[in-house]
């Protein structure tokens, strides 16, 4: 008779969960940040709000963003004028877009990740799909399973309405699945489309304008599995340790509410302060067991909620400017793509590490950290171990 302990032992992988491939995708519509205020106020029929437009121009100029990608273009917005108002019933129109476009963009990223992985998609055992928009049943996980032609018995996990911390959440979940299911190969997809949050300006709700200045569309996919097959699968990063915490005294710092008018975002001004105040504790818990206290000695992947968050974290920890380079480069080129951002940064870092002749996927360093920050205020922490190039 086989014991439960023996069954449990046989079910577990031997090594740590490892990222084996990364793919990214964006809609074709590329938006120039320097001219976006003119476009935004024109398309929302708000050119008469001259002071607010100047304020928005300053927000965009300070955002450190050069370009973003958006599914919404002028043609779509002209067909849906209610989406251009600040508070007009428009959820049906928004939902009709995102329930189609979210899995579609996710598929683009997934196809690239599967191609890099180089294994038949029939070997995918689990699917995690994450998006802040487009609640539907069956969900985007089901749609993607059908569109990719995955096996009908792939084990699916659908995560809706998570927000900007969720790039860390999906890696935490993928790690647990890969390490506790021998031979598991987890396809993780984060797909974010801002059609659910786009709205016209309001001079009484400036926090809504912050979102309009920062958010962009993008999807990223990774394959996660333990015990990579030598000469067949190419490991990129090992997922060593994960944590999630709610920052103390942070209730209401970042809120989102899905209503007839779409998804509305509300931000407290001191989000950067809350993040920087709690970053020390998160890092200590993560790296004290490794005897690491010099945070310039590790590589950094931080969700780029906005430049102020990155500036305050750098200042608080005394980080060298180059530590956040990959993070700032992704923010500059794509804007804040919510949950997908940290996966884009992982992709950027492994590519630049190879191009610049570094010895590891982590800019030549062995250990690294990945942070997600979002509604709650929730902080996700992932300790990464790089791989030799």
UniProtKB/Swiss-Prot annotation:
Listed under catalytic activity are: (E)-4-coumaroyl-CoA + 3 malonyl-CoA + 3 H(+) = 2',4,4',6'-tetrahydroxychalcone + 3 CO2 + 4 CoA
User: Per the UniProt entry, what are the Gene Ontology biological process annotations, in alphabetical order?
Assistant: flavonoid biosynthetic process; polyketide biosynthetic process
| Domain of life per record | Eukaryota
**TM regions (residue ranges):** none
The protein's matches in Pfam families, at most eight in alphabetical order, are given as:
Chal_sti_synt_C, Chal_sti_synt_N
Tell me which residues this entry annotates as catalytic. Answer: 164
EC number(s): the record gives 2.3.1.74
Please provide the record's keywords in A-Z order.
Answer: Acyltransferase, Flavonoid biosynthesis, Transferase
Pathway membership: Secondary metabolite biosynthesis; flavonoid biosynthesis
Listed GO molecular functions?
Answer: acyltransferase activity, transferring groups other than amino-acyl groups; naringenin-chalcone synthase activity
Annotated SUPFAM superfamilies: Thiolase-like
What is the purpose of this protein?
Answer: The primary product of this enzyme is 4,2',4',6'-tetrahydroxychalcone (also termed naringenin-chalcone or chalcone) which can under specific conditions spontaneously isomerize into naringenin.
What does the similarity note say? Belongs to the thiolase-like superfamily. Chalcone/stilbene synthases family.
- Protein name in the entry: Chalcone synthase 7
């Amino acid at each position: 008779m086989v014991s439960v302990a023996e069954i449990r032992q046989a079910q577990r992988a031997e090594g740590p969960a490892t990222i084996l491939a990364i793919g990214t995708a964006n809609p074709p519509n590329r938006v120039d940040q320097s001219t976006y205020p003119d476009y935004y106020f024109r398309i929302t029929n708000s050119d008469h709000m001259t002071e607010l437009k100047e304020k928005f121009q300053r927000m965009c100029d300070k955002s450190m963003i050069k370009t973003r990608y958006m599914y919404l273009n002028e043609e779509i917005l002209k067909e849906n004028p209610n989406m251009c108002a600040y508070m007009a019933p428009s959820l049906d129109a928004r939902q009709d877009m995102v329930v189609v476009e979210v899995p579609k963009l996710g598929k683009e990223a997934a196809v690239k990740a599967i191609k890099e992985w180089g294994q038949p998609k029939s070997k995918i055992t689990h699917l995690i799909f994450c998006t802040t928009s487009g609640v539907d049943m069956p969900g985007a996980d089901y749609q993607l399973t059908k569109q990719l032609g995955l096996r009908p018995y792939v084990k699916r996990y659908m995560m809706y309405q998570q927000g900007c911390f969720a790039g860390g959440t999906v890696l935490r979940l993928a790690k647990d699945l890969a390490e506790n299911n021998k031979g598991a190969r987890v396809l993780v997809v984060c797909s974010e489309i801002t059609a659910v949050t786009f709205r016209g300006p309001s001079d009484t709700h400036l926090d809504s304008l912050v979102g309009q200045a920062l958010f962009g569309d993008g999807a990223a996919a990774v394959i996660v599995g333990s015990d990579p097959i030598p000469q067949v699968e190419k490991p990129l990063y090992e997922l060593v340790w994960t944590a999630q915490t709610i920052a103390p005294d942070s209730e209401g710092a970042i809120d989102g509410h899905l209503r007839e008018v779409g998804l509305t975002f509300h931000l407290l001004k001191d989000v950067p302060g809350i993040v920087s105040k709690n970053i020390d504790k998160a890092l200590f818990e993560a790296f004290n067991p490794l005897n690491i206290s010099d945070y310039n000695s590790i590589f950094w992947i931080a969700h780029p909620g906005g430049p102020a968050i990155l500036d305050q974290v750098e200042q608080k920890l005394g980080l060298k400017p180059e530590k956040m380079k990959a993070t700032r480069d992704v923010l500059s080129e794509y804007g804040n793509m919510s949950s997908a951002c940290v996966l884009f940064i992982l992709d950027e870092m492994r590519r630049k590490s190879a191009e610049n002749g570094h010895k590891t996927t982590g800019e030549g360093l062995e250990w690294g950290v990945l942070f997600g920050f979002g509604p709650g205020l929730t902080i996700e922490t992932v300790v990464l171990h790089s791989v030799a190039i």
